[in-house]
Amino acid sequence: ERYPSLTVMQVNAASLRRRPMRHPCLVAPRSDDYVLDLPDSEDAWLASLSAQTREKIRYHWRRAQRRQPSLRFRTFAAASIDDAQLRAVIGFNRARMQAKGRRFGMDDEDQRRLCALMRERGQLSVIEIDGVVRAGLLCTLAGDDIAMHVIAHDPAFDDLRLGFLCCVMTVQDAIAQGRQRFHFLWGHYDYKTRLGGKPVALTQLLLLRARRHALRHPWRLTTLGLAALRGWLRSLRQRAGAARH
């Protein structure tokens, strides 16, 4: 067999149609990826949204342009992305988390890896005001798919909904490029479903070469077991909430 020293493989987030059959595996619910299947045209996408959402997009875009006439939307491909732009958007995200009293989810190493990934296969979308980045999306490209990793805006412009508008414009840009799917990724936020995202269950997977190899990785087994328990409890809460409504 190839790679005989490899006894275990862990995948933290995957969409599985069926369990792998060749090797023993353990699975646990991970989260949901909100996926938007992109139509052939911007008009078709807008028509698929609710009338309220379409009006909300028009209202906030016109209001932002009226308040900030220099506002413009731009995209940058991997080779033209500047680290200062990436740090600005990540900084906006950090400020938002801190303002909410929540822990920022990326340490310095996470940020370095994300910046390296952006330079390799990323697309940066920004809204600028007077030539300064005030909102942005950090996305990666894979085939016909585009995935959003970070969305953030300058807290000084909270009232203009720049993050939401930048996301809308990025979806429209993806349609113009001929992309097939837009992945909002995990985390339930109202705007993802308003813009057409549908939840797709993601699974955490531990794949073993043989059952006996499970004994070599007790920590991985414990972590996955706890993840499965959390997923089960979450599904119970969701069913209870649905029953109340």
List each model region and its residues.
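Intrinsically disordered, low-complexity, positively biased terminal segments
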Residues: E1-P20, M97, G101, G231-H245
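Acyl-donor binding region in acyl/amide transferases
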Residues: E1-R30, G143-V200
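Residue-identity detector for threonine
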Residues: T7, T53, T75, S125, ...
